[in-house]
């Protein structure tokens, strides 16, 4: 049963990233939501996407506050045959996903600050658990089929499972940009990443249907079946002891029929001993040929087996008792960042940025650990991979511009640990993203934009599990930029992400199950609004 909650130990793989790499959120502004290509930005969100590009802004002090509302639906369909329901759905909801930027630009230098959820930022809730939580419980039905010999027919199960996780890795970034000349500008800075993951969940009220009625599984196995098996073991031990006088008297080589014929045991005693042997699985033919010494050995072996089964039922019953988890993990890391902005010709701007790997360890603060899986104070590595980004923006005319962006996450440089099935989470290729966007001014103060983003995750079959899975995706964004006055900018945007279905094949150790497949699906929907103000604009 420990396996049922082992998934929660992989906190860094909770999977509430909405746009970006395996852990990194790329959706850092409303401008991004409506255009999806921002790596050559020269306005407010350049603080995150292209900090060297801040040198293209006019002098003054700038402040922008953006927020997004994000929804993600995860659907898992399992082919495991013993589950009561093959479909599991989880909802990830982020009502407020805030980001903010502040810039002070003066001639050849600019200082900037930014904040936002660098990873995570939401909560996911599985009201009916996950297949990996329930498989062990559903296996009780075939696993207890042998109890039919005790006239205890187990035909179904039910349980209450719930799991909720929240993850937020904040990013608080600061740095300085410097204009070398009209063509080149550079940036140096860092991002402080305080991280928190919170996990709560329970598995309770596990019941099995026995002879048509549901019973508490822990009580049934521990208080009914285990004592019954123990009683049968005691009877076997007594039967073995009852034939010892015959063996001591030299009749150990006789069969029960011969001992009865010789008057050493009565017909009733013979019938009782033979009935006990039949109960242990010995055939009538074997009993007829079995000497009394073997009868005694069979009863002793049967007693040992029954005692072992009783102990197993007691242990299994204890594992099926209600279990809860309430764990919080915290930690922090630093991300060094450098950037370059290049303007080779008028109208063309190129931005480049490199974020170094962030070393980050999370420490358990455990309130409830009914599984023994989350020792208080234990540490877990949750490094963030390095990121290289480059983009270009071309202004066709004062009313129209196009942009293209590329991101590459060095996922191979991070140890991703193992998934809940014990498989190493390996990377076949580093995650990369390619996006294009366009913006056109319709009338003075109003522009419309659209964007497209393709993400290739580069994960292997072993990487995914029902707890955390990734697949290639296509994202579409659109929105508006509104300027009611020269120093105020309002951004409105929405995006929709479609993920390719991911399949994971399993080979169960139970021959009756054999091979089966789980399908993983999800989709995102997001809305954003942003307000930017330039103090001192003319």
Over which residues does each language-model region extend?
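Extracellular loop and loop/strand-boundary signature of outer-membrane beta-barrel proteins
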Residues: 83-88, 158-162, 321-327, 373-379, ...
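Hydrophobic, lipid-facing positions within transmembrane beta-strands of outer-membrane proteins
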Residues: 49, 61, 96-100, 170-174, ...
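Repeated loop/turn-to-beta-strand initiation elements of outer-membrane beta-barrel proteins
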Residues: 61, 108-111, 183-186, 347-350, ...
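N-terminal, post-signal peptide beta-strand-biased segments of exported outer-membrane/organellar beta-barrel
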Residues: 15-125, 469, 495
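Transmembrane beta-strands of outer-membrane beta-barrel pores
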Residues: 67-73, 115-119, 192-196, 354-360, ...
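Outer-membrane beta-barrel "beta-signal"
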Residues: 521-538
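Residue-level signature of outer-membrane beta-barrel architecture
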Residues: 55, 103-106, 178, 338, ...
């Amino acid at each position: 049963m420990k396996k049922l909650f082992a998934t929660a130990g992989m906190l860094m793989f909770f999977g509430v990233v909405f746009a970006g790499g395996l852990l990194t959120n790329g959706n850092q502004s409303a401008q991004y939501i409506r255009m999806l290509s921002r790596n050559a930005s020269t306005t407010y969100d350049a603080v995150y996407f292209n900090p060297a590009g801040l040198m293209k802004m006019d002098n003054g002090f700038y402040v922008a506050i953006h927020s997004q509302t994000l929804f993600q639906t995860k659907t898992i369909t399992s082919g495991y045959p013993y589950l009561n329901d093959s479909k599991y759905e989880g909802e990830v909801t982020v009502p407020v996903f805030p980001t903010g930027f502040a810039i002070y630009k003066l001639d050849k230098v600019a200082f900037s600050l930014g904040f936002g959820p660098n990873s995570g930022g939401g909560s996911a809730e599985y009201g009916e658990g996950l297949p990996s939580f329930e498989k062990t419980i559903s296996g009780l039905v075939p696993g207890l089929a042998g109890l039919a010999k005790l006239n205890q027919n187990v035909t179904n199960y039910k349980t209450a499972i719930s799991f909720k996780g929240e993850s937020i890795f904040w990013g608080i970034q600061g740095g300085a940009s410097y204009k070398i000349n009209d063509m080149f500008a550079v940036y140096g800075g860092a991002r402080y990443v305080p991280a928190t993951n919170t996990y709560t969940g329970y598995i309770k009220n596990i019941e099995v249907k026995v002879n048509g009625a549901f019973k508490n599984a822990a009580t049934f196995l521990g208080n009914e079946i285990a004592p019954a098996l123990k009683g049968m073991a005691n009877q076997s031990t007594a039967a073995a002891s009852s034939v010892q006088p015959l063996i001591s008297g030299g009749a150990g080589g006789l069969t029960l029929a011969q001992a009865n014929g010789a008057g050493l045991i009565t017909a009733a005693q013979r019938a009782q001993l033979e009935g006990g042997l039949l109960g242990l699985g010995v055939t009538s033919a074997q009993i007829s040929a079995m000497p009394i010494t073997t009868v005694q050995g069979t009863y002793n072996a049967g007693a040992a087996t029954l005692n072992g089964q009783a102990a197993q039922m007691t242990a299994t019953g204890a594992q099926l008792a209600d279990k809860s988890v309430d764990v919080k993990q915290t930690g922090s890391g630093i991300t060094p960042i450098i950037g370059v902005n290049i303007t080779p010709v008028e109208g063309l701007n190129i931005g480049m940025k490199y974020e170094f790997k962030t070393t980050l360890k999370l420490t358990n603060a455990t309130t409830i650990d009914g599984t023994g899986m989350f020792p208080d104070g234990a540490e877990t590595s949750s490094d963030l991979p390095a990121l290289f980004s480059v983009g270009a923006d071309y202004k066709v005319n004062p009313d129209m511009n196009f942009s293209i962006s590329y991101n590459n996450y060095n996922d191979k440089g991070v140890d991703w640990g193992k998934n809940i099935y014990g498989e190493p989470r390996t990377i076949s290729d580093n995650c990369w993203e390619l996006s294009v966007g366009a913006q056109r001014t319709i009338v003075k103060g109003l522009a419309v934009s659209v964007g497209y983003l393709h993400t290739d995750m580069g994960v292997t079959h072993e990487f995914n599990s029902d707890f955390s899975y990734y697949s290639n995706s296509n994202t579409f964004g659109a929105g508006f930029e509104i300027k009611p006055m020269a120093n105020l900018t309002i951004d409105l945007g929405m995006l929709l992400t479609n993920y390719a279905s991911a399949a994971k094949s399993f080979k169960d150790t139970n021959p009756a199950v054999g091979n089966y497949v789980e399908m993983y699906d999800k989709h995102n929907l997001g809305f954003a609004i942003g307000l930017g103000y330039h103090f001192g604009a003319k």
